Amino acid sequence: MKKLILFELRKVFSKRLALIALIGIILFSALLSFSTFQNKYAFDQNIGKGTGKTAVEIDKEIAAKYEGILTDKKVQQMMSDFAPTSDLHGLSAIYVYQNAMQSAAFSRFSDKEGNWNGLSVSDVFGNEEIKIGYVDGWLSTSRNMVRVFVALALAVIIMLAPIFSGEYEGVDNIILTSKYGKTKCATAKVVAGIITAILTTTLIAAFNLLLAFVFYGTEGLDCSILFAPSDYVEAFIPFNITCGTLLKYQILLAFTCTLSVTGITLFLSAISKNQIVALVAAMAIFLFPVLLPITEVNPLFRLVGLLPIYHVLAISLLSVEQMSNGMLYAIWAIPAALLFLGVGAGISRRVLAKPQVS
């Protein structure tokens, strides 16, 4: 069985389209991370301004000045330090960007002229204890991971679509089933598909984390996502979790997504005699839920949000609920993924083990 699984894995990774998809994801990750890093901008009237690496260093230096638990005293200090020194020409100070810390402070505690709006920390965050620091780099990584993991799911579909349906177009199935039996061959394909999804997801997640460590260091992983610059979607998650926790959930959801689409793709590959049909159908099923007129506030989203596409569009699913044990509702993606994988793998194994004769 081990040799048969290795044989199936070699078949998956030796296909030109699969290699192109995998290399494409790696290059896309590198390009996205590098361009995000290079486009960083920060300004401070005492330190100076810069882009790219210089901007990151400026943001880190500013964050170090205020890091720790957010207090009303720190808010007043930031409002004073970052007060506009020139005419805003009608622009609201709430949306003016100087640096990451200034943007986080002004988007919550400033009026449109750049003065304190009268709100306290408890007015904005309730009884939550908000730890602040340099979070810009990790939130950029989180935002990029959404795009990367969507592409990853599509790549897994491309890699696995031919795993069963491709056998109808060749003689491999006849040779292997005569030697090992239909059940063993079907099981080997299912196991190879699961291993492919796990290995590919691990590789891409590790590569993106490595890039983040290289570009931004380790600062800020223990800081809250709630005190983030105004342009981050992560700020819409209404729960006081750290950047590290956010990334852990995202990577977990990347695995649940790829395992879910593995089950779907195995099923479609097994029932289809044409790998192109299996590929298109799997992609359509994966992407279709985003077209449904169901918003995050709709009670039905608690079910729709457990479909694979929303695992990687993580922000919506992570915003649903924080349960009494402190875990987020998104953890239900694990049993959902096991259901997709179990049903898809089970049916596809039966289809190949007992093919219908037309």
Model-derived regions: residue spans:
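Short helix-to-coil transition segments within interhelical loops
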Residues: 176-182
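Extracytoplasmic loops/domains of multi-pass membrane proteins
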Residues: 72-110
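Transmembrane helix segments
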Residues: 35-36, 272-303
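Residues that define the loop-to-transmembrane-helix transition and helix capping
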Residues: 16, 183, 275-277
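Aromatic- and glycine-rich beta-strand/loop motifs that create alpha-glucan
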Residues: 1-21, 25, 189
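Secretory targeting signals
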Residues: 24, 28-63, 67, 92, ...
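Alpha-helical transmembrane segments of multi-pass membrane transporters/translocases
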Residues: 2, 18-21, 257-265, 317-358
